[in-house]
Regions:
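A nucleotide- and high-energy phosphate-metabolite-utilizing enzyme signature
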Residues: 1-232
């Protein structure tokens, strides 16, 4: 059917199949407005397994063809449901702390902790992206991109302009550094992890990495305060 052909076309274009099955060919990711409304409601109110991850993916979705109003309707229902409950948003946002405290990454950069590579996605990229996503959900921001969400959150006073700029610059730096590391691993025919060994970075790169992780640390403090994560 068309869903199968669409997925096959993506493969031909060079997009690998999603290991998690988040694809059009998967019936769990298709449905009517009513079906989707029930699905996202269950993800939010009765989270189990990968429910919150699926909810995060849905919040980043945007229409590329067809009637965009259908997606907008489901998203509006979700925003209405979520913003009526602070505990629900706090539970969703708690994932920013899933990979340990920033202190661990700082110790590695300063040579005070265990040696070894730093997982940039866990240390900085995910906390920025998901933290901004969570604040956007709390403030009913309809934008789906992190940069657009930061801009909207700064505009409505939710996020300090200086911190917003630092987060955006830090995100771009971390993503670039991770891409560079991944390409280097690929060139050496190693498994691509995108992890970075601080000892192999230049002095400038180490300083920029420290700045980025410092912004992440301060952003997490903002999230804990605004979304009351410490009382969940």
């Amino acid at each position: 059917d068309i869903c199968e052909r669409f997925s096959e076309a993506l493969t031909c274009f060079g997009y690998p199949e999603c290991k998690g099955g988040i694809m059009l060919r998967n019936a769990a990711w298709r449905g009517t407005v009513s079906e989707w409304s029930t699905r996202v409601r269950d993800w939010l109110l009765q989270p189990e397994g990968d429910s919150l991850m699926h909810l995060a993916i849905f919040l980043d979705a945007h229409a590329v063809a067809g009637d965009a109003a259908l997606l907008a309707e489901v998203r509006q229902r979700l925003l209405q449901l979520a913003t009526d409950s602070d505990p629900l948003i706090a539970r969703f946002a708690m994932a920013v702390d899933a990979f340990g405290s920033p202190a661990g990454w700082w110790n590695r950069l300063l040579g005070l902790g265990e040696e070894g590579p730093v997982n940039l996605k866990k240390a900085g990229i995910f906390p920025i992206v998901h933290g901004v996503r969570s604040l956007a959900l709390a403030r009913r921001v309809m934008a789906t991109g992190t940069a657009e969400r930061i801009s909207a959150l700064v505009a409505d006073g939710t996020l300090d302009a200086g911190l917003g700029q630092e987060l955006l610059q830090g995100l771009h730096f971390l993503m670039g550094l991770r891409l560079q590391a991944g390409l280097a691993e690929l060139a050496l025919k190693r498994e691509v992890t995108g992890n970075v060994d601080p000892a192999r970075l230049s002095s400038l790169e180490r300083d920029l990495l420290k700045d980025a992780l410092s912004a992440v640390k301060r952003f997490k403090a903002v999230l804990h305060h605004r979304l009351r994560l410490d009382v969940v």
